[in-house]
């Protein structure tokens, strides 16, 4: 099969993406062989590219996909050949920037019928991250009448997290943005209040007169952590998804703040007993998209998968100015 990978880790200038030919991996008992029609770019793509040196062949990135099931493993029960699926994959396996891809059915969902393949590929990773952060890491319940602060509301995770919080809970949603276009996008996603994270966020929150019980720190956690401790309710909860260089959480002791990480690959990496929860939530998100309850967060289709378009997608991701999601058409796209 054809695939796109890089040969040298490091900066984007060093990342020599090439198209090459490689074998299709063998199916495991719960695996699907998917013909890939759409992929997307996430921060994990650029993080891996900077840190992971390929070994015997170029490293294939890509942690979102939508496509058609072409073959199933012996124990597969959730899907059949010909089904259209979408998923975020497993960081321990080769990525989705290829003609075909192997994925466990337990972390795969039915593709939203209302979205194109490329648009559907922009949904899984951010939806899983947002869902797990909201309900597992923060422990929010449907009838919760508290408030949540989402730092970095205009990115891929923030865009879907705002919607999930508004549609599935009673939370008041405060989201941060720093530019006019990102502020407008966050408002479009449904945020009740918007603050500017280029200013001290504890002062911004104080001016609102709201003390959030929950904080979702999606970016700049090390920069904002002291302010988070100041603004959060006693016995509140903080969940983060970024990679702060150093974080002293002792300042949260007096308020008995609950602190947790969200990493959506945990279930697949460790094959947890509940990894099927990702299959279930992706199906629910798919239904919500098809019923108009959720809206797509995709803002740009960068064209067909190639070394050139991958480099452009990585450049945009690393600019720090991404709103929503960037997607690419797969090798099999007719566009």
Where are the regions a protein language model picked out?
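Glycine-rich beta-strand-centered segment in the early N-terminal region that forms part
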Residues: 23-40, 50-92
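Residue-level marker of beta-strand positions
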Residues: 66, 83-84, 100, 147, ...
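Short glycine/proline-centered loop/turn elements that form peptide/ligand docking sites
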Residues: 74-75, 175-185, 222-223, 246
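Mid-domain Rossmann-like dinucleotide-binding core that forms the NAD(H)/NADP(H) cofactor-binding site
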Residues: 123-199
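Glycine-rich cofactor phosphate-binding loops and adjacent beta1-alpha1 units
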Residues: 142-143, 189, 194-262
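C-terminal capping/lid region of NAD(P)-dependent oxidoreductase domains
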Residues: 290-300, 311-335
């Amino acid at each position: 099969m054809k695939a796109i990978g890089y040969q040298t880790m490091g900066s984007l200038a060093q990342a020599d993406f090439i198209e090459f030919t490689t074998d299709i991996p063998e199916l495991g008992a719960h695996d699907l062989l998917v013909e890939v029609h759409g992929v997307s770019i996430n921060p994990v793509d650029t993080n891996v590219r900077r840190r992971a040196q390929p070994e015997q062949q170029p490293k294939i990135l890509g942690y979102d996909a939508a496509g058609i099931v072409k073959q199933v493993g012996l124990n597969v029960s959730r899907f059949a050949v010909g089904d259209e699926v979408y998923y975020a994959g497993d960081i321990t396996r080769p990525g989705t920037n290829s003609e075909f891809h192997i994925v466990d059915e337990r972390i795969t969902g039915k593709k939203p019928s209302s979205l194109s393949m490329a648009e559907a590929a922009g949904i899984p990773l951010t939806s899983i991250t947002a869902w797990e952060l909201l309900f597992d890491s923060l422990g929010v319940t449907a009838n919760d009448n508290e408030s949540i602060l989402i730092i970095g509301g205009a990115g891929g995770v923030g865009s879907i997290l705002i919607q999930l919080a508004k549609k599935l809970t009673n939370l008041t949603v405060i989201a941060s943005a720093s530019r006019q276009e990102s502020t407008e996008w966050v408002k479009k996603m449904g945020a009740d209040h918007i603050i500017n994270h280029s200013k001290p966020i504890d002062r911004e929150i104080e001016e609102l007169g709201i003390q959030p019980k929950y904080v979702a720190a999606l970016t700049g956690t090390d920069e904002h952590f002291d302010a988070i401790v100041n603004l959060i309710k006693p016995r509140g909860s903080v969940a983060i998804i970024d990679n702060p260089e150093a974080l002293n959480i002792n300042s949260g002791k007096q308020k008995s703040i609950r602190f947790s990480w969200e990493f959506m690959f945990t279930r697949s990496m460790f094959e947890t007993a509940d990894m099927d929860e990702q299959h279930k939530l992706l199906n629910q998100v798919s239904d919500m998209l098809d019923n108009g309850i959720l809206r797509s967060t995709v803002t740009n289709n960068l064209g067909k998968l190639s070394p050139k378009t991958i480099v452009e997608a990585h450049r945009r991701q690393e600019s720090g100015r991404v709103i929503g999601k960037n997607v690419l058409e797969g090798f099999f796209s007719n566009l």
